[in-house]
Amino acid sequence: MEHMKSAEIRRRFLDFFAERDHRIYPSSSLIPHDDPTVLLTTAGVQQFIPYFLGQEKPPHPRAASVQKCFRTQDLEEVGDPSHLTFFEMLGNFSFGDYFKKEAIGWAWEFLTEGLGIPPERLWVTIFEGDENAPEDLEAKRFWMEVGVPEHKIFGLPKSENWWGPAGETGPCGPCSEIYYDYGEEFGPGDPLEDARYGPGGEEGDARFLEVWNLVFNQYEQLRDGSLRPLEQTGIDTGMGLERIAAVMQGARSVYETDLYAPVIERAREYTGVALGDGEETDRALRILADHARGMAFLIADGVRPGNQRREYVLRRIIRRATREAYGRFGLDAGRIASLAETVADYMGGFWGELREARDEIRRVVESEAARFIDIYHSGMRLLEAEISRLEGGRFPGEVAFTLHDTYGFPVEVTREVLAERGISLDEAGFRRAMERQRERAREALEGHERAVAAFRDREIRSRFVGYEREQAETRILAIEPVPDAEGELYLVLEENPFYATGGGQVADTGWISSEKGQLEVVDAIPAGDYQVLRARVERGRFEAGDEVVASINRVRRQQIEANHTATHILHWALRAVLGKEVVQAGSYVGPDRLRFDYRYSGRVTEEELARVQELCLLKITENQPVRYYTTTLEEARKLGAIMLFGEKYGELVRVVEVDGFSRELCGGTHVRGTAEIGAFKITSNRRHGADLYRIEVITGREALYYLTRAAETAERLAAELRLPGVEELPEAVSRLREELQQAREELRQQALKRGLEEVGSLVENAESIDGTKVVTGRVAAADVRDLRQISDDVRNRVGGPVAVVLAADLDGKAVLVANFHPEVSKRVKAGDVVREAAGILGGGGGGSPTMAQAGGGNLEAIPAALERVRQILSRELSGREA
């Protein structure tokens, strides 16, 4: 069988189905389009579901794709040879066109002829039937027609070979799976005698690998659970690229394929351990490889670390990778980010969004990993202290929740650390503590909703006068205290000048005053026919019916208005430079800055961005008039006014027009003339996914401050470098960068030389414990690579059974490297030694029996850590403490 790279498998798959009249679709984003109920894209079929459900008519009845997928259900299992989070799904689909005969025939043809897999290596499964649906004899017949012997076709129950429906009702049907047979030497039993040892059997995983699943949508499940035939059948297939690559590359694990090799090799360079060195380090390398791929693709598609939904998935895999990289191997945040960068480098050829987002991937991962390293330091100290006080083998859930809630230490890390120590977590106690906190949050939220509902029940109406006036003499219609917030009130005014949050624009703030006292308005919340103001009592008392003067913060409003009009001009300029395909995807308009998210499939060059900035400045300096008027929705359409996709509009709409070149439906507040915006500076334009960009801008005083500071900084740098002018800076910086790189290399070589010069002294002072030479000491080194080289030199100079453990200060961090002769590792493992000593340094570590690494932040503890190493080696090698 031909050894085949993953890129070639992808190409052959798409070519095969294109030749059979399939339209080739690009992968959809990992963020499901227009479906907030779905966390992440988990299958190739997701982008085609509207076609299967009959909600949309497909442009072509046949489709094929390579789809990015991310599944979280087995996240805790990642680290073994088979489980993944991110993967690529090869799939072909039929929407009422071909059915089982063609799907089975083409799958067989592609595997046996397109890839050259020997037919005798392939087994298949079909649905065995139950009380609701018969055995899939049709699929069995087609498999036998292509040449599969009957004894290699296994029937499996609905739990294994049935798909759908997605809810209680809807399309569903039997599946048929294709398995690759690694050979009888890998199986514990004969599948022909006992189906448990066959494909899909509970004991068959070691021998059989599922490579392709064919789903036959032929039934509709009704509310009573019964099935009826679909008028339009469908085909949905999925073949994991990682699995078929393992088959084509003769690998027993997906992690041994070219889809993982570059990132695993980079991890090996950083850690000094390779796959096969030991069970624990193998698990760590697989976690690093999988999570590096996952974080790179999630970030490229616009996900950022956070505490909700998919944002938390990204945060969790970065933190899980950091725990292994830093806690076990002592790698810093930069090295962790470099692993994700490596993924962008070697997978960016096919997945262009990775290449585009490479810098952003590094920035996000490095920032999140650095934050977690700080959390990990403090959290591990607290966790270790709690473990030392523990009586028994059960860790209190309340304590785990406090670590999580107060100190930000993730419960999954607590869970993993405890499992490694053989301690269980009181999960019920943790859930109770979590629920108590949620109940407190619910009560606060319900209090807010109760206040709004109470106003609504009174059938009050408030008139917004903020377009015309910045101050209003008005009356309080209703007032309620804010639950659990002493001195704060919710209130509704008869005439209200405060703009309530909406359309991306933040709410106005300001003051409400009367003879009785004064309130500071901190928020304005839209609530249908009125706006609810949230205010702090500065002095006095207020009640419904009071006559008051409401005044917005005028300076703040002007800054917001400038940014909102600038957003409209920016939108126009982007469409003028990049084309009409630019579509707004979201915005933030505040007093400090504006943020504009837009969809665009191409790459935005620096030249294009400069042109956008130039056009915006031109329109601002021309002092173009800004008009607002109300018209019908139909008339607004005729005028070409831009409308937000998915937004619901009434019959009458408000149009904001900037001198005829920009028209948008908008309910926000704006300047009267564009010159009021003042300065305008684009500060960033970052890609947040395959076709999503986020541009940020500052205007007015903020922009002037920014430009003034930038000019002052440039002048100071030019003076410091003794340059005639700031225009010489770019060339000077480039020259300095080259000199710095050269100096760093010279320092590294000098440190390595000093370290190697210390080898003689270390060898002379070697101890002997029960026939084993032991060398420990602190040496000079520039990085882990040099430290390992020095340890190799010591081991070679001593010769025979020797245990070498060296320490160094690497950029302010204490790092230990253990290098053991194989004979020594049979009695004591290098990974165990450094892991135990690492606690003294305030960190963690691990590795293989012969080579390991640890690190921590406490440099002053290096002598104590080395002394602990000597004690451990004395205990393990001679049976007594030193």
Curated annotation (Swiss-Prot):
The keyword Transmembrane helix belongs to this UniProt entry's keyword annotation: no
Molecular function terms, GO-annotated: alanine-tRNA ligase activity; aminoacyl-tRNA deacylase activity; ATP binding; tRNA binding; zinc ion binding
Principal localisation: cytoplasm
Cofactor(s) of this protein: Zn(2+)
Cofactor stoichiometry and binding remark: Binds 1 zinc ion per subunit.
Coiled coil location: none
GO cellular component: cytosol
Record keywords, A-Z: Aminoacyl-tRNA synthetase, ATP-binding, Cytoplasm, Ligase, Metal-binding, Nucleotide-binding, Protein biosynthesis, RNA-binding, tRNA-binding, Zinc
Cited Gene3D superfamilies: 2.40.30.130, 3.10.310.40, Bira Bifunctional Protein, Domain 2 (3.30.930.10), Threonyl-trna Synthetase, Chain A, domain 2 (3.30.980.10)
An individual GO BP term: alanyl-tRNA aminoacylation
EC number: 6.1.1.7
Record has Cell inner membrane as a keyword: no
Record SUPFAM superfamilies: Class II aaRS and biotin synthetases, Putative anticodon-binding domain of alanyl-tRNA synthetase (AlaRS), ThrRS/AlaRS common domain, Translation proteins
InterPro entries hit by this protein: aa-tRNA-synth_II/BPL/LPL (IPR045864), Ala-tRNA-lgiase_IIc (IPR002318), Ala-tRNA-ligase_IIc_anticod-bd (IPR018162), Ala-tRNA-synth_IIc_core (IPR018165), Ala-tRNA-synth_IIc_N (IPR018164), Ala-tRNA_ligase (IPR050058), Ala_tRNA_ligase_euk/bac (IPR023033), DHHA1_dom (IPR003156)
Superkingdom of source: Bacteria
Location in or out of the cell: Cytoplasm
PANTHER family, alphabetized: ALANINE--TRNA LIGASE, CYTOPLASMIC, ALANYL-TRNA SYNTHETASE
Function (record text): Catalyzes the attachment of alanine to tRNA(Ala) in a two-step reaction: alanine is first activated by ATP to form Ala-AMP and then transferred to the acceptor end of tRNA(Ala). Also edits incorrectly charged Ser-tRNA(Ala) and Gly-tRNA(Ala) via its editing domain.
The family this protein is said to belong to: Belongs to the class-II aminoacyl-tRNA synthetase family.
Protein name in the entry: Alanine--tRNA ligase
Lineage: Bacteria, Bacillati, Actinomycetota, Rubrobacteria, Rubrobacterales
